[in-house]
From Swiss-Prot:
Keywords: Amino-acid biosynthesis, Histidine biosynthesis, Leader peptide. The gene is hisL. It comes from Shigella flexneri. It comes from the Bacteria. InterPro entries: His_leader. This is his operon leader peptide.
Length: 13
């Protein structure tokens, strides 16, 4: 569940 947080930090849709 850490990958989801990383993606959100990259570009939060």
């Amino acid at each position: 569940m850490t990958r989801v947080q990383f993606k959100h930090h990259h570009h939060p849709d």
